[in-house]
Structure formats: C-alpha cells, structure tokens
C-alpha cells in the first residue's frame, strides 16, 4: 500500500488530489456535536494543501436515500474543516454536477474544496457494478490522484471507496496508514495478556468478532445491551431487558469454546435497572435500582452495569498488556447510565497496557464524557471497519488501495 509520503515525494503542486475522507459527524440540526472525524483527516488535507495540491475532499454523511436531502448536507462539516485549517474552503452544492466542476476548476494551488454528500447519488452505494462504476467515472473526472483517508468507510464496497482508486494513482492518507498499523498490532503480534471489552446493543453485531477473538484474546469483558443475551444463555431471567433469543444457541457455544480454550469471559455481577427507557431529550432523572445480574425482576430492563461490576471490570484491566474496547457498557448518553462506560474508559487510562478504543459509540463516549483523547493509545475513527478488520475480513477500501 503506497502512502501519502510517497505521493508528496513525487510532488503534488498543481495536481487535483481527491481525498476520500470520513466527515460523517453527528449533527444536531446544523450543529456538529463531535468533530473528531474532521480533526482526524486534518493532517492529510493540511499537508497536501501545504505542498500545493488542489485538494478535493469527498465524504458521505448519514444514510440519505441516493438523492439530495438537506438534513444530510456536508455544509456544516465543510465550514468546520475550514475553521480547523484556518483557511477558506470552497463548498460544492452537488457532487459531480456543475457546482462540483466549478468548485474544482476554481481551485488554485494549496486550496481546498469539499463536495456535497456522496450518498446524494444512487451510484455511490449501488450494488450494481456498472452503476457504481459510472459514478466513479464521473468522480474521476474531478481529480488526477486519489488519497484514501476515510477509515470509517473502508469496509463499504462503494464507488468512492472501492471503484475510484482503480481509476487513478492511489495512496493511503495518514489516518488510514495509522489505523492499519494499530490494528495489525492487535492481530499479528499482540502483546499479552490481551483483554477485549465489548459492549453495544446487539450481540448479533459482535458475533463475528467474538468468534475471531476466541482464538486471540485472553479475556473478554461483555457489557451493554448484548450482555443480557449472555445472561439468558446461562439460564438467568433478564426481565424486560434487550434480548436476542435467536442468538442464545450461538452464545452458549461461544461460552463453551471459551472454557475449552482458557479464554476468560467476564459478565457483570450487578446491573442498573428501570421500568422504562430513559427520556433522552430531557435527560430527566431515571432513579434506577441496582440488582444482581442473575436476579433482574420481571418488567425491569437493564440499562448499565452496576457498581460492583465497574470495580470488577477495572480489576480485570489492570494486569493487561493490550486492551481493545468497542461499545459502551450502558446508555451512556443519559447521566444515570453513564458510569459503567466511564469506569471502563478510566480503567483503560489507568492501565499500563497499549489501549485501543474501537471507534463508533466508544469514541463518542470518550469525548462526550470529557476524557483526554491523548490518554489512550489510539482512538479509531471506524467502529464497523475496525471490527471487520479484527474478524479477518477483506475490507474493500483497503484492498483497493493495495491494488
């Protein structure tokens, strides 16, 4: 995989460099609530601009249905990128139309333009190779060189991620090079003991990575909504908690395999419960109760790991050499259910281990709960991408850059 440093050595002055970034930031109306992904691509964009490239930044945001939708405009992200760069950034109101062409043609050396949301075009995400290829052709008309730096999208077989690199000289940006380097540490030469903390709502989303980690990890800590399927698999009542009954046989099999391989599965010993899901708009006090994890009352739902579990999980992370964390321990966006996630984040900071936060909600939680991002070994920008990499899957965006 050739990197941006090789491109810079070749020289980029006056060349149109297409940067496939991941500016898929959370918005409250037009206000960006977490600009982490924009800041993550800044080194690549800034270095190219400094070297005299005419930088064309493209990204998706959200899941519009292949047509323009103002709610998913990249205009706020483009404005924030300009603020972070300390420079004017042109914004095209379409992706491959008149506005995009004018924005790119208007660039002088060292200037940056951002195209409108790639997913406003059906060809970006099409499963039809010809339709996707035709859209990639139109994107290719706007550039001389391709730099892939949207790690959060490399697991998608989309036109800008997979098809476009085949049409242009292609290089990995700083972010993708860093992400791949870190994830290789977790797969090829991991320092032991290796602990993995997995949370999030659905166990079905994590089955692939658990299956793979049973061959790699020494200890797996489970939290979040997915924990209740594990508790049910052990024969416990889980009340009104989130439960994927159809996954219980697979979970039972994984628990048995873990025993056979000497992998320690750690489940909570207590949980915070309430009769209803909290009000996420008002964040009104929810007054949860703490109950034993194996004695959740009927009609009550578990919404975070409890105080004893927080201590247990912290103790399981103190004697590790490597920790990978993906997924919150509870409904961390509500203050009454944030302490489990906070405890895990603090345990990672306190641990002497090399710590990796696996993107998605975990990365958001680190920022929302006010932790210093530099206190962790690495915070990934790709939740789904990092999980699929750890599963050993071929990621289309990386395969395209290696081709």
Q: Which residue ranges define each predicted feature?
A:
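Active-site loop-to-helix "anion-binding N-cap" substructures in soluble metabolic enzymes
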Residues: 1-403
């Amino acid at each position: 995989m050739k990197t941006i440093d090789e491109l810079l050595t070749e020289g980029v002055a006056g060349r149109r460099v297409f940067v496939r970034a991941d500016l898929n930031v959370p918005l409250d109306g037009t206000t960006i609530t977490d600009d982490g992904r924009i800041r993550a691509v800044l080194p690549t964009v800034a270095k190219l601009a400094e070297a005299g490239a005419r930088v064309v930044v493209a990204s998706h945001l959200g899941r519009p249905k292949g047509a323009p939708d103002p709610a998913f405009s990249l205009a706020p992200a483009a404005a924030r990128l300009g603020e972070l760069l300390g420079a004017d950034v042109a914004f095209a109101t379409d992706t491959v139309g008149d506005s995009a062409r004018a924005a790119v043609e208007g660039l002088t050396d060292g200037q940056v333009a951002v195209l409108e949301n790639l997913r406003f075009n059906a060809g970006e995400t099409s499963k039809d190779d010809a339709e996707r290829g035709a859209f990639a052709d139109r994107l290719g008309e706007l550039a001389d060189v391709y730099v892939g730096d949207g790690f959060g999208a490399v697991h998608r077989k989309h036109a800008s991620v997979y098809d476009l690199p085949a049409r242009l000289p292609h290089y990995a940006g700083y972010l993708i090079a860093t992400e791949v380097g870190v994830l290789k540490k977790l797969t090829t030469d991991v320092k032991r003991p290796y602990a993995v903390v997995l949370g999030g709502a659905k166990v079905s989303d994590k089955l692939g990575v658990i299956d793979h980690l049973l061959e790699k990890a020494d200890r797996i800590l489970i939290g979040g909504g997915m924990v209740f399927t594990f508790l049910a698999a052990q024969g416990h009542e889980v009340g009104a908690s989130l439960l994927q009954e159809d996954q219980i046989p697979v979970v039972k099999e994984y628990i048995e395999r873990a025993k056979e391989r000497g992998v320690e599965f750690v489940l909570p010993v207590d949980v915070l419960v309430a009769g209803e899901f909290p009000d996420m708009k008002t964040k009104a006090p929810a007054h949860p109760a703490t109950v034993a994890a194996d004695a959740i009352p009927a009609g009550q739902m578990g919404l975070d790991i409890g105080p004893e579990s927080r201590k247990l999980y912290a103790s399981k992370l103190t004697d590790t050499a490597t920790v990978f964390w993906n997924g919150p321990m509870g409904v961390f966006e509500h203050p009454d259910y944030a302490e489990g996630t906070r405890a895990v984040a603090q345990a990672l900071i306190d641990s002497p281990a090399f710590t990796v936060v696996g993107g998605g909600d975990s990365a958001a939680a680190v920022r929302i709960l006010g932790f210093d991002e530099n206190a962790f070994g690495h915070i990934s920008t790709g939740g789904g991408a990092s999980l699929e990499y750890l599963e050993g899957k071929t990621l289309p965006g990386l395969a395209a850059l290696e081709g």
